[in-house]
Amino acid sequence: MKKAKGIVLDKPGKADYRTPGSFRIIVLFETVSEILERLSALHLTSAARSLGLLHPNECGSLAGLGCFDAVATLTHEFRLLQAASFKVSTLFQDVKGGFDNVCENKLASILTRGGVSPYLIAWIKSCLSKCQCRLIFQGAPKVFCLVAVGTTQGSPISPLLFVHYIASLHLTLPKGLVISYVDDLTIMHCADSVPSNIRALQPFPGITKWQRADLLVAFSVPKTELIHWRTPKDRSDVSFAPIVINDMLFPPSQAVRLLGYWLTPTIHSSVHFLRRLALAKASFSTIRQLSVASKGLSTWWNRKLVFGPILPILTYGCDLFIPDTITLKKLNSFLHGVLQWRTNCFYTTVCSALYREASPPPIFSICKHRLWSAALPLVCAPSKFNPATARIPESVPTWN
């Protein structure tokens, strides 16, 4: 039950694929092992919540929480502080190679101090030790080898174990907030000026240095970013004040990618949707090669490809952002070309006839549906488990 197959996948956006760090190994255990890990993850989550081991602003690898909750909490906080006339800055950091550096003995010590059941701790230590893996790629030897790393990627319980492992990195800031999603940490601070925010954020990596050294983890330098939030009506000079961390200069970014959401200093939705449009076009250029006129996939399978990969890529983020009129026209123009390929019609076909033939939902309707679908779980979630729900005004009816 500890033998697994490792699927080697390349990480997108890497400059050089000649180094091992440019690839990711997804581990596939036997079905019974996956089921046991999933059940243990549910049991550990329940125990951790009852014992208070999870930070209230942790949104990763927990049932009922997702990327939307983390980003919604972040945007709500800095908009609330901006309404109080504060300047808000945020530092984004990523734990480098976090899953590989988890020490089972230190993890067991953390869980023991938290009061977790000794039987569950013993099961976790057994799960992390003496695992064997066989890599799957062309020309690979079909032999199993012992894996001497922390937690395996692809395991249902690995992200949850990592969340407990780095829980000590959540610090309490007097005028700030720390939000995390597994290995992504977001540190926000507010003050009367941007330089004051820089002075408050700059010591954070140094404060956590001894904790990170004890846990054998470090922050990734290329993924460290800074942003100074602004309101659309702010007429003051744009601040380009950088932050210095470990003798390295990090200037503020004009667009930051957080959990698939593209954030700008003024939270303009066009940047996010134009990035999603570029990804959808790249996917469509690959998919359309599978089917051309009179050959390839059938029309029914073409429709499956449109509603399967393309629309989710194009509309990701509609639960938080609403596209403006100009961006919506660009999205509809791209969708028109996709539907023309799906129905094998001319590009100049009247839109009304094309939409009746292809029968897709309009982009604007999809955005509204995604927005409502995200709001419903938000108001139904317990506020002590969901940080975004905890920030809903008392006048709004919620589960509580």
Predicted regions and their residues:
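Catalytic palm active-site di-aspartate
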Residues: 3-6, 24, 57-61, 88-98, ...
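Short, conserved micro-motifs composed of acidic
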Residues: 139-140, 217-254
